[in-house]
A protein has these predicted regions:
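Conserved, well-structured ligand/cofactor-binding cores
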Residues: 1-291
Length: 291
């Protein structure tokens, strides 16, 4: 962790700014520890201590947030962050077992917390999960906006107004129809966000360094992703081709596109409302916005 902080002092922004990323990494490491315990490749008492440590990070994230010290931008595709997580989990586990911080003969960041794993499978899986958790917040806010627009559509379903194309009078419509159209277009983008989340549910956990599962115990990839799905309640599945998935960034592009789509649609709705509320004396003033 410290070497990573010193070597990659680039943005001066720590990755602990995104709390869902810490939670997501803890879930991934917990799923891994559970799998390694079941497969008998990590001592049960060590695995249980690491599982306990992961639960601390999941349930008391703010308490340990300052322990994640690496820069957002770093070489090695996230190796510094992966080791940061391994070291935090190991030291919490060591304390839980009654040892002294840094006594890696009890719980080792490499040989225990990272057993059968690589930055190249744990880090992207954690990003996938954190993107789902964070986009859920966005979806909830968008749903509240959509519902508010639909409520106004019902309120104004009998209010006649002039419909326009290119700012020229066209044909009559109700103000309710206009509000419903805004709500519907927001709902379209909500569905696109949900569709993007489906791509994020395909992960490469257990692929290890390049997708060949080298260093992972037989059966580990399937068991680890099963654990992750059960722990989070999200239907995660491993890619059919772990080698392809290890270097693929398509899910991020799909999510980014969906977020941009929502932003563009919201901009359009905002501009419509701003124009219709223009005035108060010389503009359209068809809509009164609350002060």
């Amino acid at each position: 962790s410290l070497r990573g902080k010193e070597n990659f002092f680039i943005t001066e922004e720590k990755n602990n700014q995104e709390i869902y990323f810490i939670i997501a990494f803890a879930y991934v490491k917990k799923a891994a520890a559970m799998a390694n315990k079941e497969l008998g490749v990590v001592k049960p008492e060590v695995a249980d201590a690491m599982i306990w440590a992961c639960d601390q990070l999941i349930n008391n994230t703010e308490k340990y947030r300052d322990q994640f010290i690496t820069d957002w931008l770093q070489g090695g595709a996230g190796t510094s962050t992966n080791m940061n997580a391994n070291e935090v989990i190991s030291n919490l586990a060591i304390e839980h077992l009654g040892g002294k911080l840094g006594d890696y003969s009890i719980v080792n960041p490499n040989n225990d917390a990272n057993f059968g794993q690589s930055t190249n499978d744990t880090y992207p899986t954690a990003i996938h999960l954190s993107c789902i958790l964070r986009s859920n917040v966005l979806i909830k806010a968008a749903e509240e906006l959509r519902d508010a627009l639909y409520a106004k559509a019902k309120e104004f379903d009998q209010t006649l107004k002039m419909g326009r194309t290119h700012l020229q009078d066209a044909v009559p419509m109700t103000l309710g129809q206009e509000f419903h159209g805004w709500g519907f277009t927001i709902n379209d983008e909500i569905e696109n966000l949900r569709a993007a989340q489906e791509h994020l549910k395909i992960v490469n956990l257990g692929a290890t360094a390049i997708g060949t599962t080298v260093t992972a115990a037989p059966g580990y990839p399937e068991l680890a992703v099963k654990n992750l799905a059960e722990l989070t309640g999200i239907d995660f599945k491993n890619s059919e081709d772990l080698i392809a998935a290890t270097s693929d960034c398509g899910a991020y592009m799909t999510l980014s596109s969906a977020i941009k789509g929502l932003a563009v649609k919201m901009t359009k709705v905002c501009n419509d409302i701003r124009l219709l509320a223009s005035g108060p004396r010389c503009g359209l003033k068809e809509i009164n916005l609350p002060q």
